[in-house]
Amino acid sequence: IEVDKLFDDQIRFTQKLTRFPSLRGQEHTAQDFLFDELTKRNYALDRWTVNVEDIKDHPGFSPVKVDYSNAINIVGTHRPKKEMGRSLILNGHIDVVPEGPYEMWSRNPFDPAIEGDWMYGRGGADMKAGIVANIFAMDAIRNLGCLPAARVHIQSVVEEECTGNGALACLVSCLLYTSDAADEMRRG
């Protein structure tokens, strides 16, 4: 029931996030928005630019020839006063694939529209709605007054559509983001 109370807000939040054209190398404005929203929710926050030097020797690394100066990952962490139980990582990627020829769209791909039960907009389903679902699941739990007794990390990473290096950068930072379980929200 608490999730239902937040549903309209969650839809509006998803629309707002989908308006950011977070193509490869242009994710930073969407990440800024998420950082601000997680700050309002009192998460402990980390933000850093993905550094190829930190991940290039990892077997999961994919070589890149693009500039990572705007490849910013963010992590919001719920930290309980007294940590007990098992921790959790909720991971999602903020980057979207290019929209392709504009004339092939019946509407602006970065101005999400709702028709019936469907939202149309580039990146809405893959995977901005997943990131938003992670945030609003924690909102619902908090609104019930049932704060998790363990750390919960909400990760928004870049560079999933091409290489996965954004999630790898979070993995390599495992001293900060260890957990007993991890999930990447997928529709289906």
Question: Model-derived features: where do they sit?
Answer:
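Short acidic, glycine/serine/threonine-rich loops at helix termini
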Residues: Y102, G164-A169
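Single conserved hydrophobic/aromatic residue that forms the stacking wall/gate
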Residues: Y177-G188
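Structural signature of cysteine-dependent C-C bond-forming condensing enzymes
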Residues: G145, V172-L176
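Alpha-helical metal-binding/catalytic segments enriched in His/Glu/Asp
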Residues: L90, I114-E161
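Acidic/His- and Gly-rich active-site-bordering loop/insert found
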Residues: I1-M119, N143, L147-P148
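Glycine-rich, phosphate-binding/catalytic loops in enzymes
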Residues: W105-P109, C170-S173, M185
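Predominant activation on well-ordered alpha-helical scaffold segments within soluble catalytic domains
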Residues: Q15, F35, V132-D139, L168-L171
